[in-house]
Amino acid sequence: MASLIYRQLLTNSFTVDLSDEIETIGSEKNQNVTINPGPFAQIGYAPVDWGPGETNDSTTVEPVLDGPYKPTSFNPPTDYWMLLSPSSPGAVVEGTNNTDRWLATILIEPNVASTTRTYTIFGSKEAITVENTSQNKWKFIDLAKTSLTGSYSQYGILLSKPKLYAIMKRSGYLYTYSGETPDAITDYYTTTNYDSVNMTAYCDFYIIPWAQEALCTQYINNGLPPIQNTRNVVARPLSSRSIVVRRAQANEDVVISKASLWKEMQYNRDITIRFKFANAIIKSGGLGYKWSEISFKPANYQYTYTRDGEEVTAHTTCSVNGVNNFDFFGGALPTDFVISRYEVIKENSFVYVDYWDDSQAFRNMMYVRSLAADLNSVMCTGGVYEFSLPVGQWPAMTGGAVSLRAAGVTLSTQFTDFVSLNSLRFRFRLSVEEPSFSITRTRVSGLYGLPAANPNNGREYYEVAGRFSLISLVPSNDDHQTPIMNSVTVRQDLERQLSELRDEFNALSQEIAMSQLIDLALLPLDMFSMFSGIKATFDAVKSMATSVMKKFKKSGLASSVSTLTDSLSDAASSMSRSGSIRSISSNSSVWTDVSSTLYDLPSYMSTVSTQTATISKRLRLKEITAQTEGMNFDDISAAVLKTKIDRSAQITPNTLPDIVTEASEKFIPNRSYRILNNNEAFETSTDGRFFAYRVDTFEEIPFDVQKFADLVTDLPVISAIIDFKTLKNLNDNYGITREQAFNLIRSDPRVLREFINQDNPIIRNRIEQLIMQCRL
């Protein structure tokens, strides 16, 4: 069988371990070397943390806590909190849109019995009944009315020990705080023309950007920092916030120290970062109703901007980490809409932006210290992506938003097709924002995060402004530079070749003849026959096989087998490192443990679909350890791989290891496996579908998960090349004998070839779907 190639790679991987061990032993030899530390070493001094000192800048980076400001009337900008700090009871703040919302906040001191007090609100005296039964907390009360002549009602009570209150205009709402400190939370009021609401503050106040809402909540619950509670902090007029502070030479190069050959330079720079997201949307084979993957991909962007009168050419690479995998399963029919996997970035994700420009600061970045940066935040909102179905209304993924906040900066290396560039990697934390995203014409709605379907929302780029500073050790002669800047990127060149090769491989799927594929799948392919299509000498093929084994031992399949072997306590402890995978299949107790492990799933896996999907993902490991007479998915996978290798015009010894490894992991991701027990068949798939049925009548029976898990121990696992839905469709339309049914259930290649030679459309369509799943 063609899948022999995968078992051979797994069996012989221990020889690669031995080769690597020999190399490791050779590299661990010690050698004493005398080093002259030079004038820049801190010999004899305690470790110190050098900071960059004062950094001049001309780019505005919003302060976290701006103020305090004196009481005043003004129209505060949207998306900014007004943090109010009253010193005495009475009216705190009032605001109105002059149409349907008049809102005021008053403050009552502790220990006040029910009484009526007179407050001046919006120029009129109002008698309000108030009380505060708390012994040590001040009480904020919102007074609201919807007409000019109406009466006030009390809402949104906040009991506060720090005596702080906040209000903000955002997205059609007026946001405030309610509850009791230290557990106060945000609340809101709906209003029209919210952006025109004027506020009158009767106490000192601060301004905090909405991006720092978590810090504002911390102040509300725990009080201001100690430095804000001293007599040295004096409130100033709000007009001072508009004063433009001009600083000379924001972008400068400062010589910190200098010797004959080297000098330390401090580079202070304003920076404009533009980046965009890239994605990959892959459609599954079949009738056109299913998508296999919607994922984020790294995106390069090159642009120019003016910095301090100088035109700068910059290059950024945007990538994401910690994505969340979602899926949508509309049904098992070929015309049901399905998305096998789509990625979403949320608050547990990170966005990385690698930045490089052609300025002097990036010419020499081999030895850098005291790296610091300040960046503003940016909002990223998702757009609309329509899934073009052959028939019917198109579903659309729409919405989603996240805000990016700078979380740090490190050195990195940016790769282009020909060179590697030392650059700065800016790391951004995420928080989910409104609106949520949904898939129209489905039940998927109200989910938060930014999906990969249309992350740029029609924008050419997102932009972040800020500044950075670093100290770099550079040659004293400005004409010299360290050689790393223009070093050739071998791996990046290989990635480019692999990308082109993947596209070619995927395009070749439609050119494979099914009858020849079945014949090839039955051949016992080994490493040399698999790679014989590549023009190379015998020595080159031998070296290439070693390279493939080195890469393959790090594949997901090899790792799964290794993890499984280690987890089988008694069996694993008796195996030596040189044991092959065949020793696993010969030990009956191994799969007894596996079946027990499979059934002892965590409590949250309560559905049969989840349990069977989890079991199905491990059945491949058992099937690959024991060769059966029937054909399996790995036979088809290896045959497709061999066919594409022979037909490819771009395959090389350098790209072959990556291609073979990817094929073992990614070819035919949606697989079904069955256990045959007398006249009953149990069938499960990796996407959670499960069936139990009688072989002679194809009548469905209840699926017993416990029985299925027990049968895994004693009975062989069979690849459901022709799955239950296809079998039932074949029987309903053409009628098949009991013997043919048993042979198709056993994945007998002889019967499969007969149906293909008869040009049976149902069987041909099923095999075509499997071939189309052989994608990289």
Swiss-Prot record:
Disulfide bonds join C203-C216, C318-C380. Residues 65-224 are annotated as: Spike head. The keyword Disulfide bond applies. One of its GO terms (cellular component) is host cell plasma membrane. SUPFAM superfamilies: Concanavalin A-like lectins/glucanases (SSF49899), VP4 membrane interaction domain (SSF111379). GO terms for biological process: permeabilization of host organelle membrane involved in viral entry into host cell; virion attachment to host cell. Keywords: Capsid protein, Coiled coil, Disulfide bond, Hemagglutinin, Host cell membrane, Host cytoplasm, Host cytoskeleton, Host endoplasmic reticulum, Host membrane, Host-virus interaction, Membrane, Outer capsid protein, Viral attachment to host cell, Viral penetration into host cytoplasm, Viral penetration via permeabilization of host membrane, Virion, Virus entry into host cell. Residues 389-409 are annotated as: Hydrophobic. A motif (YGL motif) lies at residues 448-450. Residues 510-776 are annotated as: Spike foot. The record marks R231, N232, R241, S242, R247, A248 as: Cleavage. Signal peptide: none annotated. Pfam families: Rota_VP4_MID (PF17477), VP4_haemagglut (PF00426), VP4_helical (PF17478). Residues 484-511 form a coiled coil. The keyword Zinc-finger does not apply. Residues 248-479 are annotated as: Spike body and stalk (antigen domain). A motif (KID motif) lies at residues 644-646. A motif (DGE motif) lies at residues 308-310. Belongs to the rotavirus VP4 family. In group A rotaviruses, VP4 defines the P serotype. This is Outer capsid protein VP4. The lineage of its organism: Viruses, Riboviria, Orthornavirae, Duplornaviricota, Resentoviricetes.
